[in-house]
Amino acid sequence: MTRNDVGIAVVGGGIGGLTLGLALRRHGLPAQVFERAPELTEVGAAVALAANGTRVLRELGLSDQLAAVSTVPSELVYRHWSDGRRLVAHPVGDWYRDRFGAPFWGIHRAHLQRALAEAWGGAGLHLGKELTEVRERADGIELGFADGSTVRAGLVVGADGVNSRARRSICDTTPVYSGTSGFRGLVPRDALPSLPDPDAVQFWMGPGAHLLHYAIGDVINFLAVIEGPAEWRWPAGTAPAEPGELAAHFAGWHPAVIEMIRAVPQSPCWGLYTLPPLRRWSRGRIVLLGDAAHAMLPHHGQGANQTLEDAAVLADCLAEYGSGEPAVAFAHYERARRARTRQVQRSSWVTSALLHLPDGPAATARNNDLKQLVNRFSWIHEYDHRSQAHAVGA
């Protein structure tokens, strides 16, 4: 058994953990990142980064590197499930950047993870460290890992995802299945001759299902969401799917949707989970970040972006109020973040049902509401973390 002393231990080497490490470094706060996987890999094909997320990455000096491997969508388009009509459209591209002060990017998760890891460097990243125990000591927190090693830290940040082990030290809240599931895929553009506006972010909305897609370079990333199964019986996050299962759910939809689904092998089915609101995000010297604190449904494309916000605000609060006795910093962090992330969670949950309406008066009313989308949800995209550490203390 080995033991090392670190100032701040970040549990989880995903987008949130690495971003936090980089943000702490900018403030001169030493941290070490502990990741359970033996090597860094990202689950999921791609991620949409809105202005509230790209603003954080720009401040970390990663803007040019990430822009080179990202795709900027031309529009946000909502379409009818069967005839493909453009029901509502909003500009993105330069208009979005000028409106919100930072760009919108579609990017491979692997490219984002790689850029963060390279910026962080290998010296502060410890792989193969599966957290098994959290023990409070008089001089800090002792973390025990599955390989038998231990680490004593002055402060611990749980950035270890929706099934967070660190969260058990704060509360016993567990994720809740939404009653919906998703299928992911990456399709070459040239395999989709029927697809209109391939450079746009597009939602195809229909009875009991929807399909979202956007371009990542020469491929189209899609997420198809269906209702059911009623109960999630698989212990892992995915369930096996039979060949053609997804296509059967979208029978009768527009040819572009069918082309997209049939262009790739049948993927596993992902259960879509959310995390009920936590009464607190911290206890003692332990605090949560990202999905560990507020896992949400993907229908606003805000999971990664809210995690980036968390990382920036937490680093700012620790720098402003001190990491030696973190209670004050944690309190400011929670006040800055809990209400906002809860609002995004609620809105994402409601959006799930709205995207699945059958044709009729309710769908018509939804389409009219979508025309005001930019005004209704500007509060998400225009967020600037730099005002938060000070604002919550005012």
Where are these regions (language model features)?
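A short coil-to-beta-strand element that immediately follows conserved catalytic motifs
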Residues: 177-179, 197-200, 243, 255-270
